[in-house]
Protein backbone atom coordinates (compact mmCIF):
# COMPACT_ATOMS: atom_id res chain seq x y z
CA UNK A 1 0.00 0.00 0.00
CA UNK A 2 1.37 3.37 -0.95
CA UNK A 3 2.09 5.97 1.70
CA UNK A 4 -0.43 8.27 0.04
CA UNK A 5 -3.19 5.67 0.34
CA UNK A 6 -2.19 4.93 3.95
CA UNK A 7 -2.34 8.66 4.79
CA UNK A 8 -5.80 8.90 3.20
CA UNK A 9 -7.04 5.94 5.27
CA UNK A 10 -5.61 7.42 8.47
CA UNK A 11 -7.17 10.79 7.67
CA UNK A 12 -10.54 9.13 7.01
CA UNK A 13 -10.33 7.23 10.32
CA UNK A 14 -9.42 10.41 12.22
CA UNK A 15 -12.25 12.37 10.60
CA UNK A 16 -14.67 9.52 11.33
CA UNK A 17 -13.52 9.40 14.97
CA UNK A 18 -13.93 13.17 15.27
CA UNK A 19 -17.44 13.05 13.79
CA UNK A 20 -18.37 10.16 16.08
CA UNK A 21 -17.05 12.08 19.07
CA UNK A 22 -19.11 15.15 18.10
CA UNK A 23 -22.22 12.98 17.65
CA UNK A 24 -21.77 11.28 21.04
CA UNK A 25 -21.17 14.63 22.75
CA UNK A 26 -24.32 16.05 21.13
CA UNK A 27 -26.40 13.08 22.28
CA UNK A 28 -25.05 13.40 25.84
CA UNK A 29 -25.86 17.12 25.85
CA UNK A 30 -29.41 16.47 24.61
CA UNK A 31 -29.99 13.82 27.27
CA UNK A 32 -28.63 16.08 30.02
CA UNK A 33 -30.79 18.99 28.89
CA UNK A 34 -33.88 16.78 28.73
CA UNK A 35 -33.12 15.66 32.31
CA UNK A 36 -32.66 19.29 33.41
CA UNK A 37 -35.41 21.31 31.76
CA UNK A 38 -36.06 25.01 32.17
CA UNK A 39 -39.77 25.44 32.86
CA UNK A 40 -41.86 28.06 34.66
CA UNK A 41 -39.00 30.51 34.11
CA UNK A 42 -41.28 33.54 34.56
CA UNK A 43 -42.07 32.44 38.13
CA UNK A 44 -38.58 31.16 38.92
CA UNK A 45 -37.03 34.47 37.82
CA UNK A 46 -39.64 36.53 39.70
CA UNK A 47 -39.39 34.72 43.04
CA UNK A 48 -35.66 34.03 42.84
CA UNK A 49 -35.21 37.78 42.56
CA UNK A 50 -37.83 38.63 45.20
CA UNK A 51 -36.39 36.25 47.81
CA UNK A 52 -32.74 36.36 46.72
CA UNK A 53 -32.43 32.67 45.89
CA UNK A 54 -30.25 31.64 42.95
CA UNK A 55 -32.43 30.64 39.99
CA UNK A 56 -30.34 27.55 39.42
CA UNK A 57 -31.06 26.43 43.01
CA UNK A 58 -34.82 26.79 42.48
CA UNK A 59 -34.63 24.85 39.22
CA UNK A 60 -32.59 22.14 40.97
CA UNK A 61 -35.04 21.73 43.85
CA UNK A 62 -38.03 21.63 41.49
CA UNK A 63 -36.25 19.10 39.28
CA UNK A 64 -35.34 16.78 42.16
CA UNK A 65 -38.62 17.20 44.05
CA UNK A 66 -41.13 16.80 41.21
CA UNK A 67 -39.36 16.61 37.85
CA UNK A 68 -41.45 19.71 37.02
CA UNK A 69 -44.74 17.83 37.52
CA UNK A 70 -47.07 20.44 39.00
CA UNK A 71 -49.78 17.84 39.68
CA UNK A 72 -47.57 15.58 41.80
CA UNK A 73 -48.80 14.55 45.25
CA UNK A 74 -46.46 12.26 47.15
CA UNK A 75 -47.43 9.51 49.57
CA UNK A 76 -46.66 11.79 52.53
CA UNK A 77 -49.07 14.43 51.18
CA UNK A 78 -46.49 16.87 49.84
CA UNK A 79 -47.85 18.76 46.86
CA UNK A 80 -46.83 20.42 43.63
CA UNK A 81 -43.61 21.44 41.96
CA UNK A 82 -41.71 21.99 45.20
CA UNK A 83 -43.38 19.15 47.14
CA UNK A 84 -44.28 21.18 50.20
CA UNK A 85 -46.20 19.71 53.11
CA UNK A 86 -49.24 21.14 54.82
CA UNK A 87 -47.20 21.78 57.99
CA UNK A 88 -44.62 23.82 56.07
CA UNK A 89 -47.35 25.83 54.35
CA UNK A 90 -48.98 26.56 57.73
CA UNK A 91 -45.64 27.72 59.09
CA UNK A 92 -45.04 29.99 56.10
CA UNK A 93 -48.60 31.31 55.94
CA UNK A 94 -48.07 32.85 59.38
CA UNK A 95 -45.67 35.25 57.67
CA UNK A 96 -47.07 38.56 56.47
CA UNK A 97 -46.08 37.73 52.87
CA UNK A 98 -48.66 34.99 52.54
CA UNK A 99 -52.37 34.31 52.78
CA UNK A 100 -53.11 33.00 56.27
CA UNK A 101 -56.04 30.96 54.96
CA UNK A 102 -54.25 29.26 52.08
CA UNK A 103 -55.63 25.92 50.99
CA UNK A 104 -52.88 23.31 50.64
CA UNK A 105 -54.24 22.44 47.19
CA UNK A 106 -53.16 25.93 46.08
CA UNK A 107 -49.68 24.44 45.80
CA UNK A 108 -50.77 22.71 42.61
CA UNK A 109 -50.56 26.18 41.08
CA UNK A 110 -46.97 26.62 39.80
CA UNK A 111 -46.70 30.27 40.80
CA UNK A 112 -47.93 29.62 44.34
CA UNK A 113 -45.64 26.61 44.74
CA UNK A 114 -42.58 28.47 43.47
CA UNK A 115 -43.37 31.53 45.58
CA UNK A 116 -43.67 29.50 48.78
CA UNK A 117 -40.71 27.29 47.88
CA UNK A 118 -38.40 30.21 47.12
CA UNK A 119 -39.42 31.96 50.33
CA UNK A 120 -38.82 28.78 52.35
CA UNK A 121 -35.40 28.21 50.76
CA UNK A 122 -34.40 31.79 51.64
CA UNK A 123 -35.70 31.30 55.20
CA UNK A 124 -33.65 28.10 55.56
CA UNK A 125 -30.54 29.66 54.04
CA UNK A 126 -30.82 32.65 56.39
CA UNK A 127 -31.08 30.26 59.33
CA UNK A 128 -28.29 27.84 58.35
CA UNK A 129 -25.99 30.06 56.22
CA UNK A 130 -24.99 27.17 53.92
CA UNK A 131 -26.92 25.70 51.00
CA UNK A 132 -26.05 22.10 51.89
CA UNK A 133 -27.55 22.50 55.35
CA UNK A 134 -30.55 24.47 54.07
CA UNK A 135 -31.25 21.79 51.45
CA UNK A 136 -30.97 19.06 54.09
CA UNK A 137 -33.52 20.96 56.21
CA UNK A 138 -35.81 21.41 53.20
CA UNK A 139 -35.92 17.62 52.89
CA UNK A 140 -35.59 16.32 56.47
CA UNK A 141 -37.06 19.25 58.41
CA UNK A 142 -35.54 21.88 60.63
CA UNK A 143 -35.91 19.88 63.85
CA UNK A 144 -34.00 16.95 62.40
CA UNK A 145 -31.21 19.14 61.03
CA UNK A 146 -31.02 21.10 64.29
CA UNK A 147 -30.54 17.83 66.20
CA UNK A 148 -27.75 16.81 63.80
CA UNK A 149 -26.07 20.19 64.22
CA UNK A 150 -26.14 19.71 68.01
CA UNK A 151 -24.44 16.31 67.71
CA UNK A 152 -20.64 16.43 67.40
CA UNK A 153 -20.73 13.20 65.41
CA UNK A 154 -22.45 15.10 62.56
CA UNK A 155 -21.31 18.68 63.07
CA UNK A 156 -17.92 19.85 64.27
CA UNK A 157 -18.96 23.47 64.76
CA UNK A 158 -22.72 23.30 65.38
CA UNK A 159 -23.28 25.37 62.23
CA UNK A 160 -22.60 23.04 59.31
CA UNK A 161 -23.02 19.34 58.75
CA UNK A 162 -19.81 17.36 58.34
CA UNK A 163 -21.87 14.21 57.88
CA UNK A 164 -25.54 13.62 57.08
CA UNK A 165 -26.56 10.46 58.96
CA UNK A 166 -29.77 9.77 57.05
CA UNK A 167 -29.12 8.04 53.71
CA UNK A 168 -32.22 9.51 51.98
CA UNK A 169 -31.36 13.05 53.08
CA UNK A 170 -27.73 12.55 52.04
CA UNK A 171 -28.86 11.32 48.59
CA UNK A 172 -31.31 14.22 48.29
CA UNK A 173 -28.67 16.84 49.08
CA UNK A 174 -26.28 15.21 46.61
CA UNK A 175 -28.97 15.17 43.89
CA UNK A 176 -29.91 18.83 44.44
CA UNK A 177 -26.25 19.90 44.45
CA UNK A 178 -25.60 17.96 41.25
CA UNK A 179 -28.65 19.47 39.53
CA UNK A 180 -27.77 22.95 40.80
CA UNK A 181 -24.23 22.59 39.44
CA UNK A 182 -25.59 21.48 36.08
CA UNK A 183 -28.07 24.38 35.86
CA UNK A 184 -25.47 26.88 37.02
CA UNK A 185 -22.77 25.70 34.63
CA UNK A 186 -25.08 25.22 31.64
CA UNK A 187 -27.53 28.10 31.84
CA UNK A 188 -25.69 30.82 33.82
CA UNK A 189 -22.39 32.63 33.32
CA UNK A 190 -21.16 34.90 36.10
CA UNK A 191 -24.65 34.85 37.61
CA UNK A 192 -26.26 35.96 34.34
CA UNK A 193 -28.75 33.76 32.51
CA UNK A 194 -27.67 32.51 29.10
CA UNK A 195 -30.74 30.36 28.49
Q: Model-predicted segments: where are they?
A:
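Substrate-binding/active-site groove segments that recognize
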Residues: 47, 76-99, 115-117, 148, ...
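Catalytic and substrate-binding regions of cell-wall glycan-acting enzymes that process beta-1,4-linked
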Residues: 127, 136-191
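Short, functionally critical alpha-helical segments immediately adjacent to catalytic or ligand/cofactor-binding
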Residues: 52-70, 114-118, 134-140, 176
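Export/targeting segments at the very N-terminus of extracytoplasmic proteins
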Residues: 20-71, 93, 186, 194
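Second-shell loop/turn segments in exported
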Residues: 30-34, 45-47, 70-79, 99-110, ...
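Cell-wall polysaccharide-cleaving catalytic domain and substrate-binding groove, primarily
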Residues: 63-88, 141
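Surface-exposed patches in mature extracellular/periplasmic domains of secreted proteins
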Residues: 57-59, 72, 101, 128-137, ...
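N-terminal Sec-pathway targeting helices
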Residues: 1-23
Amino acid sequence: MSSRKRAAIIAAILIGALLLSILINSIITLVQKSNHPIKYSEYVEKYASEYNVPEYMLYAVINVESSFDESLRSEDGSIGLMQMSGDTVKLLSSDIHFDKDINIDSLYDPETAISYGAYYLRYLFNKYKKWDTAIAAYYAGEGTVDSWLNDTEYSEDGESLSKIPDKKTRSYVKAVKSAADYYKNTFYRNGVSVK
